[in-house]
Regions:
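Catalytic zinc-binding patch centered on the HExxH motif and its immediate surroundings
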Residues: 169-184
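Catalytic Zn2+-binding segment of zinc metalloproteases
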Residues: 192, 197-201, 210-229
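Post-HEXXH active-site segment of zinc metalloproteases
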Residues: 218-245, 324
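Metalloprotease/metallohydrolase-associated module, dominated by Zn2+-dependent proteases
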Residues: 247-316
Length: 507
């Protein structure tokens, strides 16, 4: 027995060394309230003592951090970090993430359950099913831009053995939303990219979401959700709902009761396919399922880390508030907003978070950054068309105005603006404005879609300019004949031919 007593400290030290995670950082801090080290020395640390933290260990379920104090190596309990005032100036971005991890709720969870590998394996199975419910947005330029932002915010994984490898993926949805997966995959919606209006706002949101991943929030929440429906049954239900709500593009109908409405078109040119998206009808269920229905405390923890990262990057300290304000305003004009309970909305604690960040009534975020609007233009264009097809005309106009004001509009934007004006106005002045935009589109477009001639014809008819309408309908028919035969093309040619015959008879 006595030999065991002699050997036990050595065995414990060996086990601790195995748990020691060699970090590359020295995190300086100043003691602000007296406490003692957690090693056998139990040294008293008075206020003003300088401490440099490095590796952490988990010893008998307790988080311990190695510290250099007055040239001596000591151990500090993770529960005593609240007595330290961290000195972050001069630290690398990685070091700041490591310091934030040490101060977060993740360290306590790690000491109790390790990396929760069993839960993570179960979550990975859920992610495979989740991937089947979304459509990824294809824009290589945008993907590369987001990767550059990620490297600024999160250059590498600072916590050794952390299972997450950060990646950003864009999915199609009009709703401003994100899904921060425990494996490091961060899904961000086209609707959110369209809602934000500066790179710094995007950085703030991404930093906040990375914090959720880094601090294992979804893993913790998923573990607590003991009443989970069987995986196959749940995702089968989600896919059924998704199939019903994602058919946002109307089936092509060239003739409806003898008349034609361009609103019945797929949505011109590049938007002729059904658009699959994760709608608000199922986003809440999915977030809850995957452990991403965060508590207010988890949101606040992630918010504080985002603020610290933005300060470190010398970015606008109001960027997170600006981003939240834009999301809040976008939600309020959403047709789905009034039908949802607060808990069902993508950001259930959003207004409370805004207040904590200093939000006041009548607060106005700054003007949009044209460079950011240009980079994210395709996502905004996609969102605008989806909003239009859903009947959200106010939101559609907001998105179009953002594109136009930033000089980021292309043919599809001008055409959508024209269609929107016809859908919402009978004023001749609005029709004249639409015609000016269409002519500008013709001058700037790299290549013309046949539908621009159709849209110009509809505007001429609104203005009662029969000759102009006849000319553009001829142009439309000729352009259709030169293009590859697509679905419904024969019907469109037949319709425009009938229209020309009708006009020739003066009807």
């Amino acid at each position: 027995m006595k030999y065991f007593l002699y050997l036990f400290p050595a065995m414990l030290l060996m086990s601790c060394c195995g748990a020691l995670l060699a970090q590359d950082y020295a995190i300086p801090a100043v003691v602000k309230e007296r406490f003692r080290t957690s090693d056998t020395n139990s040294e008293r640390l008075d206020a003003g003592t300088i401490v440099k933290l490095s590796d952490y260990r988990i010893i008998v379920g307790s988080p311990q951090i190695r510290a250099e104090i007055n040239g001596q190596e000591r151990m500090v309990s993770g529960f005593d970090l609240k007595y330290l005032d961290f000195q972050l100036n001069g630290l690398s971005t990685d070091a700041i993430w490591y310091q934030q991890f040490l101060q977060s709720s993740a360290l306590d969870q790690l000491s109790k359950r390790g990396w929760d590998q069993e839960v993570r394996r179960e979550l990975q199975e859920e992610y495979l099913s989740f991937n089947e419910t979304i459509t990824l947005f294809d824009d290589p330029y945008l993907e590369d831009y987001l990767n550059q932002i990620r490297l600024q915010l999160f250059p590498k994984q600072p916590v050794k053995k952390h299972p997450a490898v950060m990646r950003i993926r864009v999915y199609e949805s009009v709703e401003p939303g994100t899904f921060a997966c425990a494996n490091g995959d961060l899904f961000i919606s086209t609707g959110l990219l369209a809602t934000l209006q500066s790179q710094e706002e995007l950085q703030a949101i991404l930093a906040q979401e990375f914090a959720h991943i880094q601090f294992n929030h979804s893993v913790d929440n998923f573990r607590r959700n003991l009443s989970r429906e069987a995986r196959a049954a749940f995702w089968s239900g989600v896919l059924t709902v998704a199939a019903a709500v994602t058919e946002t593009a109307v089936a092509n109908q060239s003739i409806r009761n003898g008349t034609f409405s361009p609103v019945d078109l797929y949505a011109f040119g590049a938007f002729t396919e059904s658009i699959s998206m994760l709608s608000s009808a199922i986003a809440f269920q999915v977030a809850n399922r995957l452990g991403m229905e965060y508590t207010f405390e988890q949101e606040s923890e992630a918010d504080q880390t985002a603020l610290i990262l933005m300060q470190h990057l010398k970015a606008d300290n109001q960027a997170l508030l600006n981003a939240y304000t834009r999301i809040y305003e976008a939600q309020r004009i959403s047709r789905a907003y009034q039908l949802q309970t607060r808990e069902e909305r993508p950001y259930p604690h959003l207004y409370r978070q805004m207040l904590d960040l200093g939000y006041q009534l009548n607060y106005e975020p700054p003007a949009a950054d044209p460079a950011y609007i240009s980079v994210t233009a395709m996502a905004r264009r996609n969102t605008a068309w989806q909003e239009f097809l859903s009947g959200n005309y106010e939101r559609t106009q907001q998105l179009l105005t953002t594109q136009l004001d930033a000089d980021a509009a292309v043919l599809e934007d001008y055409m959508l603006q024209s269609v929107l004006l016809r859908q919402t106005s009978n004023e001749a002045g609005d029709m004249e404005r639409a015609m000016l935009l269409l002519r500008k589109a013709e001058q700037e477009a790299y290549s013309l879609s046949p539908e621009i001639h159709l849209e110009k014809a509809m505007i001429f008819l609104r203005l009662d300019e029969q000759e102009g309408a006849r000319r553009e309908l001829e142009n439309y028919r000729n352009a259709l004949k030169k293009t590859d035969n697509g679905e419904g093309q024969a019907d469109r040619i037949a319709w425009v031919t009938q229209m020309l015959e009708k006009m020739s008879r003066g009807r």
